Design a protein with these regions (language model features):
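Acidic/polar loop patches that form or flank catalytic/metal-binding clefts of enzymes
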Residues: 95, 214, 326-330, 405-407, ...
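A cross-kingdom feature strongest in bacterial/archaeal respiratory oxidoreductases
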Residues: 11, 70-71, 89, 177, ...
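A glycine-rich, hydrophobic/aromatic-adjacent loop/helix-cap motif
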Residues: 387, 393, 404, 409, ...
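Conserved short loop/turn motifs at secondary-structure junctions
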Residues: 181-191, 395-398, 423-431, 462-464, ...
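Long, C-terminal catalytic modules of enzymes
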Residues: 622-675
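N-terminal export/assembly segments and adjacent metallocofactor-ligating motifs
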Residues: 2-326, 333, 350-352, 356, ...
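A glycine-rich phosphate-binding loop feature that marks nucleotide/adenosyl-phosphate handling sites
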Residues: 183-184, 334-335, 412, 455-466, ...
Length: 789
């Protein structure tokens, strides 16, 4: 049991015991999915505070006193955005409540409540957490990154020394040696946001000074972003969730919103609403583990071995194809690569016509004259002769789903409309690109795309009525002189040995001011020009937490600073002493969202909101917001006027609000009134959007079951990454979304012999990535646990 000192350190107005008691009343899942609606009207009863200004009251309907109420928001990366109501007494946040304005029922033209889950409501434990960084810190000279030995320094010293290092790096390597790390610890704001890195205050500051090395894609969607478009040209579009009331069947494929998007403004409340309003729908959850979503809303749970989804889909399609259930004329008109008799002509249509597509074959040497169609794959013919038919029984032996269940699933897709909503877990495997393509393929081949009640097989579309307030400050991307970019995942290689990194080995691309990336005209044309020497790490715990093989990363962080490898400097600006902060050379204390001014936006279904966040409390300790840090550095670099344009952070917030009004936001208030009210909502009566692909953005303009882009890449790319990775045959790029044996996955007999259990990760309720991972209340209700089948 944690000590009372631990509880006090969290700045709570509710004790851990009271929180756990609430969990016992509602059930842990219910508590973390959102408490019942209550009247949060305050009374004049006195609130007792201890010597630290902490409340001693528990969670209850007892009256409590406060001086002021301030609107804020939850800024973590859960995929939704919720407003929060902060009650302040004597300069201390004593209670965090939620939105209770409007109805809890979704309907066109209705204003509904966007209630925060208990992660959001536990934010006092984040504000007053004992792990908060209080002063600027500098790594002690002679110590290694990761040892955790730091000395306190002044802000003046920190800014001066950081700026001098930046000047030295630029003089020696140019702007190519600077990198802004991926970080999602501060999402949803405008001025304060940490993601996407290219629209942050850091990006604006760096672009004022010549730019930095950018990256493409992100840790959430590393494979679906680029591989799903190989099939349908679009990684994101799907029917709006409220259209699920028109579905006969709903398939949540690797999608667990009860954990990942569990607030009142997110998917879990929407799918609960759908279940209530469409009670006869079959809700099938395909997932390796029995998730809270499967238990809470599912009518059928289909456990599948991780990474074997392409085999499951192949078994379904073999059954439908051999039974004559598929619409042949529809497939021949809208798809290429499915049937054997047209395959060679099909792939000519799918040839990339320019380097706007991956796998552009400038010399025209990668033609195909043999049958590599999906039909051949299913039947064990053509190139796949000798591999056997991909019957449901074959699929069952791989994916673990009984053959009769595979047939039942296939029938479900033919007896639609059937909606498919794919989470982002399935694509987080070595063969994740084929997984994500195959899931979308079964939805599309069975005629469930472009219709009400159907869906594309991508992530859900949540709708909303967005305000037109810009999502970020102008970032001056046109001033960025660095023309190359790398994958979000490959920064570590650019530290150790950038010389092996080009388009063919590590996927290096060119990038323009809009963020659009272009592929090489010929393999090997695009090369990285410099090592990463300086990293800005804001609100990010990627480098020693979310990233893979962190032990090897620690080795890379401590490489000597030499001409072509090794870091010169890592600067972390964060709220907490995270593992990533502890490998930094300078650690700068950041304000929470509740100590600065900003705007957040959000919404779902028929409601949208804009929230003007005002500081609930003064900045604690010596903490500064990212805008102020960038201003100070910009001043040292001689670009302060360019960076600020003479505006403070609050001035920028007002400017953004004015831009929204000019773009058509009908708020009907002055900025002071906007700030005073805090939370604004709007609604409409739109019909739920249906994803209707009028123009499919593939080379052929059709759905590409066989991707010539992928096939060409398999011939052009060096899958050893320039000799860095062993040529062991595990890594593959395939034209068809087929199942193959991936390293340390099911079917890898060498690994399974010694390690019969396969370890996978899944999101828990108690945290979002590592955000909220230091909140004692949440951990006590939902501790980190290992599940085993």
């Amino acid at each position: 049991m944690r000590s009372s000192a631990d509880t006090r350190a969290c700045g709570s107005g509710m004790s851990r015991r009271s929180f756990v008691t609430a969990a016992g009343v509602f059930g842990a899942g219910a508590v973390l999915a959102g408490c019942a609606k209550k009247d949060d009207t305050a009374s004049s009863s006195a609130l007792e505070l201890d010597e630290n200004g902490m409340s001693n009251q528990s969670l209850s309907t007892e009256p409590f006193a406060y001086d002021s109420v301030v609107w804020g928001g939850c800024h973590v990366n859960c995929g939704s955005r919720c407003p929060l109501k902060l009650y302040v007494k004597d300069g201390t946040v004593v209670r965090v409540s939620t939105d209770v304005d409007g109805s809890d029922d979704f309907k066109p033209g209705g204003i509904y409540q966007m209630r925060s889950c208990l992660r959001g409501r536990s934010n006092r434990q984040r504000i007053y957490n004992e792990t908060r960084i209080q002063k600027p810190l500098k790594r002690v000279k002679g110590t290694k990154r990761g040892e955790g030995k730091y000395e306190e320094i002044s802000w003046d010293q920190a800014i001066s020394e950081i700026a001098e290092i930046m000047k030295d790096v630029k003089e020696e390597y140019g702007n190519d040696a600077f990198y802004i790390q991926y970080g999602t610890g501060q999402l949803g704001g405008t001025v304060s946001k940490s993601w996407a890195p290219d629209v942050t205050a850091l990006a604006r500051m760096m672009n004022c000074w010549g730019g930095y090395l950018r990256h493409y894609c992100d840790y959430s969607t590393g494979q679906i972003t680029w591989e799903l478009p190989l099939f349908n040209g679009d990684a994101w579009s799907n029917n709006e969730v409220t259209d699920l009331v028109n579905s006969k069947n709903i398939v949540l494929w690797g999608n667990n919103p009860a954990n990942t998007r569990m607030s009142g403004s997110a998917m879990v409340w929407l799918i609960t609403w759908v279940k209530e309003n469409n009670p006869d729908a079959n809700i099938v959850v395909i997932d390796p583990h029995l998730s809270d979503t499967a238990i809470g809303v599912g009518t059928q749970w289909v456990p599948v071995r991780p990474g074997t989804d392409p085999a499951l889909v192949a078994g379904m399609l073999h059954y439908l194809h051999t039974e004559g259930r598929l619409d042949e004329s529809f497939i021949r008109e809208k798809f290429i690569g499915f049937y054997s008799d047209t395959f060679v002509d099909d792939v000519k249509q799918g040839e990339p016509t320019s380097n706007a597509f991956m796998g552009f074959d400038a010399d025209g040497t990668l033609s195909i004259d043999e049958d590599m169609s999906y039909e051949a794959y299913l039947m064990g013919a053509g190139t796949y002769r000798g591999t056997g038919e991909k019957t449901p029984e074959w699929a069952s032996s791989i994916c673990g789903v009984p053959a009769d269940t595979i047939r039942w699933l296939a029938d479900l897709y033919m007896d639609g409309p059937t909606a498919t909503i794919q989470g982002w877990g399935p694509q987080r495997h070595a063969n994740g690109g084929n997984v994500t393509r195959s899931i979308a393929m079964i939805a599309t081949l069975t005629g469930n795309v472009g219709i009400s009640g159907g869906g594309t097989g991508a992530r859900e579309g949540t709708g909303g009525v967005p305000y037109k307030i810009p999502a970020n400050l102008p970032n001056f991307a046109d001033r960025n002189s660095v023309e190359t970019c790398i994958s979000f995942f490959d920064w570590y290689q650019a530290i150790e040995d950038y010389t092996v990194m080009d388009d063919r080995t590590w996927g290096v691309r060119t990038i323009d001011a809009t963020g659009a990336t272009t592929y090489a005209r010929k393999p090997g044309d695009i090369k990285l020009k410099a090592p990463i020497k300086f990293i800005w790490n804001y609100a990010s715990n990627v480098m020693l937490n979310q990233h893979a093989d962190v032990n090897d990363c620690l080795r890379i962080f401590n490489l000597p600073d030499e001409k072509d490898s090794g870091l010169r400097c890592v600067v972390t600006h964060d709220i907490y002493l995270t593992p990533t902060a502890m490998i930094s050379d300078y650690i700068l204390p950041a304000t929470t969202s509740y100590e600065e001014t900003d705007i957040i936006k959000g919404g779902t279904a028929w409601t949208g909101f804009a929230c003007c966040e005002s500081p609930a409390i003064d900045p604690m300790f010596e903490c500064k917001p990212i805008y102020e840090v960038c201003r100070l550095v910009a001043a040292e670099l001689g670009v302060e006027e360019d960076f600020t344009e003479g505006r403070t952070q609050e001035d920028w917030v007002e400017w953004l609000w004015e831009q929204g009004k000019e773009a058509g936001d009908d708020i009907g208030a002055t900025f002071e009134e906007f700030k005073e009210k805090g939370l604004w909502k709007q609604t409409d009566e739109h019909t739920p959007a249906i994803a209707k692909p009028e123009a499919i953005k593939t080379p052929s303009g059709k759905y590409e079951v066989f991707s010539k882009q992928a096939y060409n890449l398999s011939k052009q790319w060096d899958l050893t990454c320039g000799g860095v990775i062993p040529d062991d045959g595990y890594d593959q790029i395939t034209g068809l979304p087929v199942w193959y044996v991936a390293k340390e996955a099911y079917g890898d007999d060498a690994a399974m012999k010694d390690y019969p259990f396969q370890l996978i990760g899944h999101h828990t309720k108690s945290r979002t990535h590592s955000s909220y991972g230091n909140v004692a209340w949440l951990e006590s209700v939902h501790p980190q646990q290992l599940w085993i089948n």
